[in-house]
């Protein structure tokens, strides 16, 4: 089984404003999962996530429910900066997605949402993951410029910028800029074309909408 721990701050005023503490909002309550729900499951029939002292914890041994047990914010966001710290157990594998649409025609968050990878450095029985699948990667699209991932059980930090006005995305992993990318346009289309997501148009679960939603 795997365990993932996360705590999160979000800044939604990153566009043309000076950042200050008042711009940031804490997304995780001191207890419970208020403000969050399981993907396509607002009735909370799924399990696996818990909140311990303001830290979100996923324990796969407690997972129940069919299909995807990803956790989704109740609020929808478009352009933002998000800061969070995370650590995983040995073999842990997770990720942060944006632009996720929960229409029932999409069976998984990755049908629509691009992902910044969260991964144990020794994932897959100690073998080194594909660079585009390593921690800090824009999953299967861009490998991080530098591997700064820490060992399982140690805290990592992400500061992720998604700015649709400037058409700009950025990942800072443990204080180091590891990737920059466009969110749409020719360069984005080319990345998708050369990835596993290029075939999603032919699959019933995707409907060809990967990376198409600016709000989610």
Language-model-detected regions and their locations in the chain:
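Bacterial Sec-dependent N-terminal signal peptides
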Residues: 1-19
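Carbohydrate-interacting regions of secretory-pathway proteins
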Residues: 14-216
């Amino acid at each position: 089984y795997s365990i993932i721990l996360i705590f999160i701050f979000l800044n939604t005023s990153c566009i043309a404003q000076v950042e200050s503490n008042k711009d940031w909002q804490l997304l995780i309550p001191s207890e419970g999962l208020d403000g969050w729900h399981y993907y396509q499951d607002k009735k909370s029939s799924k399990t696996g996530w818990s909140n311990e002292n303001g830290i979100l914890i996923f324990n796969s041994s407690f997972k129940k429910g069919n299909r995807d047990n990803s956790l989704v914010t109740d609020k929808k966001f478009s352009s933002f900066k998000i800061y969070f710290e995370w650590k995983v157990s040995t073999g842990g594998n997770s990720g942060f997605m944006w632009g996720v649409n929960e229409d029932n025609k999409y069976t998984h968050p990755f049908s629509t949402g691009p992902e910044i990878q969260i991964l144990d450095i020794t994932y897959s029985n100690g073998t080194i993951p594909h660079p585009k699948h390593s921690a800090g990667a824009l999953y299967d699209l861009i490998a991080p410029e530098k591997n700064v991932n820490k060992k399982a059980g140690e805290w990592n930090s992400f500061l992720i910028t998604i700015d649709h006005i400037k058409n700009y995305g950025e990942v800072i992993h443990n204080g180091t800029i590891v990737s920059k990318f466009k969110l749409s346009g020719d360069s984005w289309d080319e990345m998708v074309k050369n990835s596993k997501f290029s075939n999603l148009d032919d699959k019933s679960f995707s409907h060809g909408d990967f990376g198409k939603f600016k709000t989610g």
